[in-house]
Amino acid sequence: MQTSDTRALPLLCARSVYKQYSGVNVLKGIDFTLHQGEVHALLGGNGAGKSTLMKIIAGITSADSGTLEIGGNNYARLTPVHAHQLGIYLVPQEPLLFPSLSIKENILFGLAKKQLSMQKMKNLLAALGCQFDLHSLAGSLDVADRQMVEILRGLMRDSRILILDEPTASLTPAETERLFTRLQELLATGVGIVFISHKLPEIRQIADRISVMRDGTIALSGKTSELSTDDIIQAITPAVREKSLSASQKLWLELPGNRPQHAAGTSVLTLENLTGEGFRNVSLTLNAGEILGLAGLVGAGRTELAETLYGLRTLRGGRIMLNDKEINRLSTGERLLRGLVYLPEDRQSSGLNLDASLAWNVCALTHNLRGFWAKTAKDNATLELYRRALNIKYNQPEQAARTLSGGNQQKILIAKCLEASPQVLIVDEPTRGVDVSARNDIYQLLRSIAAQNVAVLLISSDLEEIELMADRVYVMHQGEITHSALTGRDINVETIMRVAFGDSQRQEAAC
């Protein structure tokens, strides 16, 4: 963070930036400035225009009008190559790595020969506290480590303007602190950072200034110390919310055939001494009508466990019982038919077909059940139902999923999972990259689902989210669950963190 108001010329100054897509104005005369040695946080609801503005600055797309002043020079438009040459690097919310290449190859990919310094890369790895093997395949990394690799790519390019899009979305508190420490070191060298996030406590910790976007405009901007939390939330929230949003409470009842026949409290999913890649001897029971939280540090084995339950990874030992029937040998499709549905952590690579239409994506799992072929009119009607329930923002049902903002993509993925009529719904980081308003919509929906006696397994790195949502909580530590479920007053951030870090005293007390 900056400690002085003495500043040279701004690193970046965007003036009167306009952008339109398909006749819809997504940016309406944006002014945005970034100075040396400062963190300028950018907030806003889904579809507010944050990603579009950053893509224009990074040269990925061009503005219809307006200018970018960088280093004292004015530019009407940039290309990605030109942006890199000017020291601009965008670290995307969804890391864009080559999974079949090594970590080292990914970091060095596209660098000029003069920048190919192994010693520099090793120094950066050490400074960030990254423990991964440079020769391992990038595809073997979890989301948090892929995020670190993307940041390293930017640092290797001597970036002066670093754009971080939800950089802490999948990081643990300890990893976030380590990242912030490294960012402080970068700021001292004169680097400017645009920090896109929905986590207000983190923004207050790291940012010098805050700008809030709403409906393609800057609704609020100022020094962090001078803006209250109420001011920020009010600026993010639309002045008028659709009355149809309350349909999320009625959504489940409106979907024929989506009512599991289990009484509340009935055991629906039981794991008996499960062992697989990244976890061992995991036992737990998930009951109808409850939200069971699964917490733990990144790398604790939570996602690996979820993918094994859904049949995406090989089970090495133990039994998975769904409705008192073993499903160990069933395929993913057969598990889906029996009501086990999984919402993956990485929506872009695992959850959605980005080139397919929104309507097709929402009904993709039911297409498989009825012979794959889509019924356009029915799919469009289904999408409209979820649009009203989840307040999804889009222009037409035929548009590709990749054209939506990250938060609206997440809502499409949630709708896709709900349309598959789950009896057990496993949600892995369901609010990752989602703004405050949309997050509350998703929370309301998950509670509504559980109220219809669906069993919900909630995996989240956001411990406050776990505390708010879960009826019971298991914590994984180094691939194991070594304590009984937390309940009642024990479901709090402090207790969860102690268990996640292997607090033996807490574990013994809980058993």
Swiss-Prot record:
InterPro entries: AAA+_ATPase (IPR003593), ABC_carbohydrate_import_ATPase (IPR050107), ABC_transporter-like_ATP-bd (IPR003439), ABC_transporter-like_CS (IPR017871), P-loop_NTPase (IPR027417). It is a peripheral membrane protein. It comes from the Bacteria. The keyword DNA-binding does not apply. Pfam families: ABC_tran. The keyword Cell membrane applies. Part of the ABC transporter complex LsrABCD involved in autoinducer 2 (AI-2) import. Responsible for energy coupling to the transport system. This is Autoinducer 2 import ATP-binding protein LsrA. It comes from Escherichia coli O157:H7.
